[in-house]
């Protein structure tokens, strides 16, 4: 049996890990000890969590947890997006040379991050490009929430048709996966609808 802490970038990732991911991992003997909204700043003695662009605060938060949990049966991972990554993130600027090789770029950044934290139990995960990219694995599942918007559903299908892999939907300011969803469905509630659509799609297809 192993225990796992997940540091999530936002509420969408937190809900996904707390529900769908936790159930899947438990079946394989890995139990999520806690899903923590990752720190992004510390002001006036208070830690502010979720999102943010301060890598230093995020690293300090993770290191603090690794020091508190010294057992060999506990591991640490993350759920953060490649899109809009912190400017001071380890390997951030060097990884630009790999922009044309997105999976290699993510692997390079994960390796750089792991080395920077310096604990073998820390196995970071960076999503290419956003969590919402996973939802494009089967966009038809959005019909449960937007059945009265067939034109929007068709637009989702056309976006996927233009890519070999939903994860390759790019990370531009206006074209990142979440931006496309908000453009098509302005009332899209990402922290609620996102994890529910992911559950409908299923981890096997998302993977």
Sequence positions of predicted segments:
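C-terminal accessory helical subdomains adjacent to catalytic cores in phosphodiester-
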Residues: 14-44, 59-207
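Extreme N-terminal starter segment of soluble prokaryotic enzymes
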Residues: 1-5
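Non-catalytic terminal and connector segments of soluble metabolic enzymes
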Residues: 48-55
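Catalytic nucleophile-elbow at a beta strand-turn-alpha helix junction centered on a G-D-S/GDSL motif
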Residues: 6-15
């Amino acid at each position: 049996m192993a225990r796992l802490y997940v540091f999530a970038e936002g509420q969408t990732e937190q809900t996904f890990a707390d529900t769908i991911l936790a159930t899947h991992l438990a079946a394989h003997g890995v139990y999520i000890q806690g899903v923590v909204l990752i720190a992004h700043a510390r002001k006036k003695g208070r830690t502010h969590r979720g999102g943010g662009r301060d890598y230093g605060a995020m690293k300090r938060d993770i290191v603090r947890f690794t020091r508190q949990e010294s057992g060999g049966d506990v591991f640490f991972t993350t759920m953060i997006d490649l899109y809009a990554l912190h400017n001071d993130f380890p390997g951030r600027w060097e990884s630009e040379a790999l922009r044309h090789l997105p999976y290699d770029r993510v692997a390079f950044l994960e390796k750089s991050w792991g080395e920077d934290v310096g604990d073998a139990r820390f196995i970071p995960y960076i999503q290419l490009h956003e969590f919402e990219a996973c939802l494009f694995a089967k966009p038809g599942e959005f019909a449960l929430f937007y059945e009265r918007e067939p034109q929007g559903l068709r637009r989702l299908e056309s976006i996927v048709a233009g890519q070999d892999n939903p994860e390759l939907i790019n990370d531009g300011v206006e074209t990142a996966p979440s931006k496309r969803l908000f453009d098509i469905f302005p009332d899209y509630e990402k922290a609620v609808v996102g994890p529910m659509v992911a559950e409908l799609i299923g981890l096997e297809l998302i993977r």
